[in-house]
A protein has these predicted regions:
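Glycine-rich phosphate-binding loops of nucleotide-dependent enzymes
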Residues: 2-256
Length: 256
């Protein structure tokens, strides 16, 4: 069976700088896969290529067996990609609930006419979107805060709201870019429980993360990047005992 996501020998150059060299990875349906490595290893560049923000210098990317290399970001998102970023991107002066509803806009079918005259079709879609948004806020434990401004939420809850916004796209693959960055221990544990819920729902996740405890607890497989190359891949147990990984990254991560 073909992988849900397949990255085949991707190289990315910026002028004379090579950010990625022959990177290959795959993610199967329902898996949680991690990408780790030192700062500057090329992790976010890889995510940017997968989601269409960058074009690879060479290599190919497939989703469900269909090539998506060089498709624009909005077309890739429409195929079922949801993504969070290192820097939180929310509508600060909108409510938590409205932040999720806005994220659903690209999936609605109502026309401008429907919206202006509030036709039965528009009312039906509004009702469906509201029900889905409320479901997602319960999933990420933000139901009680649904009418609060996004900017009023503590950092950890803003991260969870960003995940809810990504999930609003009815995605086939969720990409999380350092979801636990900047969180305290309690916030990280709460996030871990939410990701476990997503796993139980058969959500497929590819994530970048520096918190090794988080990665080892939630990922089924891990790829390790160093200087733009995959130097190892395997289960958490295999990665934690790989001497090349320890030398390149894990020893540094433990010191931080």
């Amino acid at each position: 069976m073909a992988s849900l996501l397949s990255v085949e020998n991707v190289t990315k150059q910026f002028g004379g700088l090579t950010a990625l060299t022959d990177v290959a990875l795959h993610v199967d349906q329902g898996e949680i896969v991690g990408v780790i490595g030192p700062n500057g290893a090329g992790k976010t560049t890889l995510f940017n290529i997968i989601t269409g923000l960058y074009s690879p210098t060479k290599g190919r990317i497939f989703l469900n067996g269909k090539e998506i290399t060089n498709l624009p970001p909005h077309k890739i998102a429409a195929l079922g990609f949801g993504r969070t970023f290192q820097n939180i991107r929310l509508f600060a002066k909108m409510s938590v609930l409205d932040n999720v509803l806005v994220a659903m806009h690209s999936k609605t079918k109502s026309s401008l006419f429907d919206a202006i005259f509030h036709t039965p079709r528009a009312r039906r879609e509004d009702k469906q979107c509201l029900a889905r948004a409320e479901e997602l806020l319960r999933l990420v434990d933000l139901w009680e805060e649904r009418y609060e401004y996004a900017s009023s939420l503590p950092y950890g809850k803003q991260r969870r709201l960003e995940i809810a916004r990504a999930l609003a796209l009815d995605l086939s693959l969720l990409l999380l870019d350092e979801p636990a960055a900047g969180m305290n221990e309690q916030e990280t544990q709460e996030l871990l429980e939410i990701v476990r819920k997503l796993k139980q729902m058969n959500t497929t996740i590819l994530l970048i993360e520096h918190d090794m405890k988080f990665v080892m607890n939630i990922c089924e497989r891990i790829y390790v990047l160093d200087y733009g190359r995959v130097i190892a891949d395997g289960t958490p147990k295999e990665i934690s005992s790989n001497q090349a990984v320890i030398d390149a990254y894990l020893g540094l991560a433990e010191d931080e």
